[in-house]
Amino acid sequence: MLISIAFLLVLYLLNYSSFRMLKSFLTLKKISQYAYLWFFILLSIGEAAFVFYRNIMPSHLFVLTSACSFVSFIIFILSLSFYGFSYSIEKIDFLHSRRKSLKNFLKLGFYLALLGYFWRGFYEGLARPKIKETPIYLDKLDKELKIILLTDMHVGSLLQKDFVDYIVEEVNQKEVDMVLIGGDLVDESIEKVKSFLLPLNNLKSTHGTFYVPGNHEYYHGIEPILSFLDTLNLTILGNECVHLGGINLCGVYDYFARKRQNFAPDIDKALKKRNESKPTILLAHQPKQIRSLKESHSVDLVLSGHTHAGQIFPFSLLVKLAQTYLHGLYKHSPTTQIYVSSGAGYWGIPLRFLAPSEIAYLRLLPKNQA
């Protein structure tokens, strides 16, 4: 609750600051000031509704209210940038003669930047995810292994069966050895999305489909979600390890549940039955799960999602602070690499900016082929 209140206060501070800056550099008339004031009041009401009632509100209201915080942040960043330009115009002497024309240009630039940001954001957000290929070299690997990593599909009120059908069709074209689903598959109660998930039964690969939950599965009822997914043509890796394709494939429950008694992540348990002569891959939804690894765990590769690559720049800067690894392939230690997918779907409104979605196609190769 305290974190929620703190988050809301930060949003209110952003809204207040944005209003003051807009009022200053746009030199708003009285009627325009009232219009902007009511806009920020409505924005703040939407943010309060989201913070306190997001888990019980209808899906269309969830999408609408979740958009409010995105809008606040974007307007604040643009307002701060253009306020800085406006301040410079006032302070730089040789610009005084052109001050009026420059300020008019600045006003136009602000509205164009705002329009362009949202146009590009919705364009990227609504675009279908493309397959992104990445080679990864591993010690102890005998032969090439082709993997599809799907994360953050967020199947729910906006991303439905047609989206899952598209994903399955794209994946099946690659003829891979295994498909890994790295959490946040579901973003509604399972009763609302059962029919949307059925196409997952059609995923094709040599060794099958494997899944670990993300934090959103816990939000919407982890037990009924796992019970339903257990009826599909996939294997749930809940702190478990399987041996196939010349590797140890291990999976853990999500970091979000680390203080729960049930469905909590347990890396020691997940890795207990691994074959140490083979490379070990750990499927964990959040990248920061890697902080729990010890050198003795001997994990060669961690596969994660969760970050959406920030989804909306400059949110990515905040996400990187929380998760360390944002998107792509990183070397965590001399013996451990981590790949973080930007995700196939989106959370909240269909908006992505400088963070395109992806279907990660990972080609694991013996290190001697590097």
Swiss-Prot record:
MF terms (GO), sorted A to Z: metal ion binding; UDP-2,3-diacylglucosamine hydrolase activity
Protein's GO biological process: lipid A biosynthetic process
Annotated binding of a divalent metal cation 1, by residue: D152, H154, D184, H308
Names of the cofactor(s): a divalent metal cation
A Pfam match: Metallophos
Cofactor note: Binds 2 divalent metal cations.
Enzyme class: hydrolase
Family label: Belongs to the metallophosphoesterase superfamily.
Protein name from the UniProt record: Uncharacterized metallophosphoesterase HP_1044
Species the sequence originates in: Helicobacter pylori (strain ATCC 700392 / 26695) (Campylobacter pylori)
